[in-house]
A protein has these predicted regions:
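Acetyl-CoA-dependent GNAT
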Residues: 5-76, 87-93, 142
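Conserved catalytic-core motifs of GNAT/GCN5-like acyltransferases
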Residues: 101-103, 116, 121-137
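Conserved GNAT acetyl-CoA-binding A-motif
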Residues: 93-105
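Short glycine/proline-centered loop/turn elements that form peptide/ligand docking sites
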Residues: 83, 87, 108-111, 128-133
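Extreme N-terminal starter segment of soluble prokaryotic enzymes
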Residues: 1-3
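Residue-level recognition of the GNAT/N-acetyltransferase active site
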Residues: 74, 78, 105-107
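Conserved acetyl-CoA-binding loop-helix of GNAT-fold acetyltransferases
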Residues: 79-92, 112-117
Length: 143
């Protein structure tokens, strides 16, 4: 598996994965396109397996912090360590003395476990954060 920076040509496959992983709250084509093309403070990493994009993570950078705004792995390839590889790559590339933040659905137990195992801590709850009304757990990891 190869982790690389995203390219404009990745948009269709990222959108396909996004819709399959988040059917009720998927980002739009325009939202994903912005993440891929607005490079001032954003970065998207993708992971390829057998020359096919199978997962991605989208980041936004601020002063002394990085926000993981979206991450997904093709549902047919989940639970085999791809998400962990992407997350570790993200964490390995955080600038020194920065913190990483993310929101995760309160009921997304596999993702919560992944983040806790990576060292993230719960710091807050955002009520009714997602379009379906589910709360988000805000998590932070200080480097």
């Amino acid at each position: 598996m190869i982790i690389r920076a995203s390219e404009k040509g990745d948009l269709a496959r990222i959108l396909q994965i996004e819709k399959s992983v988040f059917p009720n709250s998927a980002w739009t084509r325009a939202m994903i396109s912005d993440e891929l093309t607005l490079n001032v403070d954003r970065k998207t990493w993708v992971i390829d397996s057998n020359k096919e994009l199978v997962g991605y993570c989208m980041l936004r950078y601020g002063p002394n912090e990085v926000h993981l705004v979206n991450m997904a792995v093709d549902p047919s390839l989940q639970k085999i360590g791809i998400g962990k590889k992407l997350l570790n790559h993200f964490l390995d590339n955080i600038p020194k003395d920065s913190s990483a933040y993310l929101e995760v659905k309160r009921g997304n137990f596999p993702a919560i476990k992944l983040y806790l195992n990576a060292g993230f801590k719960d710091i807050a709850i955002r009520e009714d954060y997602y379009p379906d009304g589910e709360d988000a757990i805000v998590m932070c990891l200080k480097k």
